[in-house]
Amino acid sequence: MRAACLFLLFMPGLLAQGQYDLDPLPPFPDHVQYNHYGDQIDNADYYDYQEVSPRTPEEQFQSQQQVQQEVIPAPTPEPAAAGDLETEPTEPGPLDCREEQYPCTRLYSIHKPCKQCLNEVCFYSLRRVYVVNKEICVRTVCAHEELLRADLCRDKFSKCGVMAVSGLCQSVAASCARSCGGC
């Protein structure tokens, strides 16, 4: 019984030793794995760093200091003749923006305390009160966004443009004003 217990105790160790058995040959020997690359490596390109005579760190530092840098100026465009200048049509970019002020009215709902008294007993209750606040608001308007909005409006509500050109704007003025800002 004692021998069986000792055998079972040492069994995992014996199994583990068998897994890590050292073979004299690696699983992928170099001579088998890389032999077809031998003809592709040119021996003239091979550089053995061990053949170089070792230099002291001071000599290496001095050789690094002797390296000169050559500064090459960047090419500058030659100025064109006055007749050759062509201006390209540019579309408004993201920098073509302006701040625009407009009157805006905001409606707020607040709870205002309201004092109510009955004979000599007073109590407070909250009453909902609507406050109209007239302000001057500021928005940033960019030209490229206005062009996109105008294109979308023209595509989506083409009848507004047709009616405006033909002079019949009043017949569709309400729908055009809601969608595109009027005729």
Swiss-Prot record:
Domain spans labelled ShKT: 153-183
Disulfide cysteine pairs (residue numbers): C153-C183, C160-C176, C169-C180
MF GO annotations: fibrinogen binding; fibronectin binding
One of the GO BP terms on file: positive regulation of cold-induced thermogenesis
Subcellular localization(s) per the UniProt record: Secreted, Extracellular space, Extracellular matrix
Database matches in InterPro entries: MAGP (IPR008673), ShKT_dom (IPR003582)
Recorded superkingdom: Eukaryota
GO cellular component: collagen-containing extracellular matrix; extracellular region; microfibril
Pfam families given in the database record: MAGP (PF05507)
Compositionally biased tracts (Low complexity): 59-70
Positions of modified residues (Sulfotyrosine): Y46, Y47, Y49
Modified residues (Pyrrolidone carboxylic acid): Q17
Listed PANTHER family: MICROFIBRILLAR-ASSOCIATED PROTEIN 2 (PTHR16485:SF3)
Family label: Belongs to the MFAP family.
Protein name according to UniProt: Microfibrillar-associated protein 2
Organism whose genome encodes this protein: Mus musculus (Mouse)
